[in-house]
Regions:
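C-terminal folded domains that constitute the principal catalytic or ligand-binding module
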Residues: 115-118, 122, 128
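Phosphate-binding beta-loop-alpha motif at adenosine-nucleotide cofactor sites
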Residues: 17-20, 121-125
Length: 142
């Protein structure tokens, strides 16, 4: 008997909705990353993209515990001397709340082609409305 290997063509991709209102940012991001990667499926195969679609609503209402609202920074570097850019979490939430959720999920996925392909299946919205009702998404309790 040989080990089962999932084929990308044989997988059916379902849509899930995660409501981030009042939930910690990290726990919501973990649930989304697990679904995007496909690790919740019994036929998960590490080298095959078996993930599904995820819609995150109310991204602006995600919370952080402790003093992270004041102390958490997102950093990036241009590669040049003095090219460090830092933005405080509360400033990011004031301007682009969906970007904070996107960064949290992105950093939980692998840094390879499967991770980049998984990010294309992530849809983030600040309100309760989304434009994917035609796909009949299922509510996911994270």
């Amino acid at each position: 008997m040989s080990t089962f290997m999932a084929k990308k063509e044989a997988l059916d991709r379902r849509w899930y909705v995660i409501d981030a209102a009042g939930k910690p940012l990290g726990k919501t991001a973990v649930a989304a990353a697990t679904i995007l990667r496909g690790k919740h499926r019994p036929e998960f195969t590490p080298h095959v993209d078996c993930g599904e679609f995820v819609i995150i609503i109310n991204a602006d209402k995600a919370v952080l515990t402790g003093k992270k609202l004041e102390q958490k920074y997102y950093c990036r570097h241009s590669g040049y001397i003095g090219g460090m850019k830092k933005i405080q979490y509360k400033n990011l939430m004031a301007t682009k709340p969906e970007k904070a959720m996107e960064l949290a999920v992105r950093r939980m996925l692998p840094d390879n082609t499967i991770g980049r392909k998984s990010m294309t299946r992530l849809k983030i919205y600040t309100g309760t409305e989304h434009k994917h009702e035609a796909q009949k998404p299922v509510a996911y309790n994270a």
